[in-house]
Amino acid sequence: MKVARVSEIKLLDREAAEKYGVKEEILMENAGASVARLAVSLIGLPMSAAVVCGPGNNGGDGLVAARHLSSMGADVKVFLVAAPDKLAGIVKENYERVVKAGIAVEVVDEERAEGLSEELSLFDVVVDALFGTGLSRPLEGVYRKVVEAINGSGSLVISVDIPSGVHGDTGQVLGVAVRADYTVTFGLPKLGNLMYPGAELGGELYVHHISYPRALLEDSRLKVETNDPVPLPPRRPDTHKGDYGKALFVAGSRRYMGAPLLCSKSFLKAGGGYSRLATIKSIVPFLGVRAPEVVYEALEETASGTVAYGNLERILELSKSSDIVAVGPGLGLEEETLRLVCDLARSVEKPLIVDGDGLTAVARCGEYISERRAPTVLTPHAGEMSRLTGKSVEEVRASRVDAALELAGKLKAYVVLKGAHTVIATPDGRAYINLSGNPGMATAGSGDVLVGAIAALYGLGLGFEEAVRMGVFVHGLAGDIAAEERGQDGLTSVTLMNYLPKALRALREDFESVLERYTIKVLP
C-alpha cells in the first residue's frame, strides 16, 4: 500500500477535485461517515459519543461523524474547540448542519477544558477531531488541555486521520498528543501514522479511501509504501546447496565471537545453501563447535585480535566464488581492519551487505560505495546512521524516512534503517516501511541475524531489492512468531535465528494469511 506525505495527500485532494470532480465536500462527507461506522461497529447501539472538534478540516470531519452517529441512533455531543463565528467554508456548513439536526454543541475555552476529562469519561467513545495531519507546531493553551482531557477520560478514543498532536510526516509528538485506541486515516496512510511514536499513539490503524479514484491511490509519484511480502521462489526437487546461494561473511574478532556465528548460521536457517565464514584463526575452533554446518576460512589477525589488512587478496579471491558478500559484523574498530573494509567495498565485485563495524569504515570512505557497480545494502541502526550522515541521533529518529532516502541517494546504495518499523530506502528515491517485528527483537545480535536473512533471500533467487525487503520482513516475522510462542521478554538473537525456518514455512504454506496480517485494514 502506498504511503503519503502531507504535501502529497493535499495534492491528491486537489487532483481529485480538478481532474475527477470529487470535491472536498464529498471527501469530508465520506471521511466523517467512515469514522461513525467504525465507532458503531466497535461498540454497537445504543451508544454515547463525544466528538471533539477543532477549527479546521479535521474538525469538519468530526462534525460529519457527529451527524452520522446521531442519525444512526447514538447519543451525541459535540465539543467545539473553536469560536463558531470563526469557522469557514465547508467546516462552517457542517457545523450548521449539526446545529439544525439538534445535536448538542458546547464551545470549549481554556477554562472549560479544565474539567472536561470528567465529562468525557461519561461517554462510550470519544472522537478526536481536534487537529489532523496539517499540524506543524506544538499544541499549547486550550488545545493542550483538551488533549490531556481526552487522554485522561478513560473512554475508548478514535482519532480522525491521525492522533491530534502527532506530526503528519514524522510521527513525532508536537508538545502533547492524543493516545488513541483506533485511528481512521483517509485516502492513504501518512508517514506519521506509521512512524513511531505516532504509530503507537494511533492504536489500531484503519484506512478509508473516501472515494479517491484508484489512479490517485496508486500514483507513481508516491515514492513510499509499506513493505508487503512477496511469494518465495520454490525449492525444486532436483537442486543442491549451490542453487540456494553461496554467501561469504567477513566477520568477527577476538572480542566479538557471537556476531560471525549469528550471521553465517542465520543464512542457513533462512534457507541459504552454502555459508562460508572468513574470520580470525584464533576463534575458528570455538565457532566450529557451535556451527559445524558453516565452512570456515581462517584469517591472519592483528595484535588486538581483529582481521588483519594482509588478508585483502585472499578475501577478494574467496568473493569470486560467492554469490553475495557480507562485511562488518563484530569486526571491531582496529584502524587497519577499517581500512580493509574500505578496500573490500571498493574491490568486491559481488552484491555486498555492510553492517556493524563495517559501517564505521564506510562513514570514512563512502565514495567507494557510490562507485560500486554491484548493488550494496547498508544496515545501520540510528547510532550508526548518525555516523554515516553527520546528523545527530535525535535528527535521524525525528525523520527516519528522509534520513534513509538521503543516504541511499548519496551513496547509490540500499539503506536499511533499523528500528521500530524499519525503513528500507532505494538508490532511486523510493522507500518501504516494514510492519513486521516487535520490541522483543531489541537485543544484541538481532542485526547479525538480519544480515544472514538478507543474504539467504538473495540466495533463494530473489532479485537484490526484493531480497533486502524480504530479508527485513522475514526477520520481523520470525520475531513475531517467536514472541507469540515465547513472549517478548528474554527473546535472544539465537532464539530469533531459530525461528527463521518457521517464518519461511508460514510464507510458503499460508502466504495469504501472512499478507493479510501485515496489511493495513481498509474500511468498506
Curated annotation (Swiss-Prot):
Residues 9-218 form the YjeF N-terminal domain. (6S)-NADPHX 1 binds at residues 143, 161. Residues 224-524 are annotated as: ADP-dependent (S)-NAD(P)H-hydrate dehydratase. GO terms for molecular function: ADP-dependent NAD(P)H-hydrate dehydratase activity; ATP binding; metal ion binding; NAD(P)HX epimerase activity. It catalyses: (6S)-NADHX + ADP = AMP + phosphate + NADH + H(+); (6S)-NADPHX + ADP = AMP + phosphate + NADPH + H(+); (6R)-NADHX = (6S)-NADHX; (6R)-NADPHX = (6S)-NADPHX. One of its GO terms (biological process) is metabolite repair. (6S)-NADPHX 2 binds at residues 330, 448. Residues 224-507 form the YjeF C-terminal domain. Keywords: ATP-binding, Isomerase, Lyase, Metal-binding, Multifunctional enzyme, NAD, NADP, Nucleotide-binding, Potassium. In the N-terminal section; belongs to the NnrE/AIBP family. In the C-terminal section; belongs to the NnrD/CARKD family. Bifunctional enzyme that catalyzes the epimerization of the S- and R-forms of NAD(P)HX and the dehydration of the S-form of NAD(P)HX at the expense of ADP, which is converted to AMP. This allows the repair of both epimers of NAD(P)HX, a damaged form of NAD(P)H that is a result of enzymatic or heat-dependent hydration. This is Bifunctional NAD(P)H-hydrate repair enzyme Nnr.
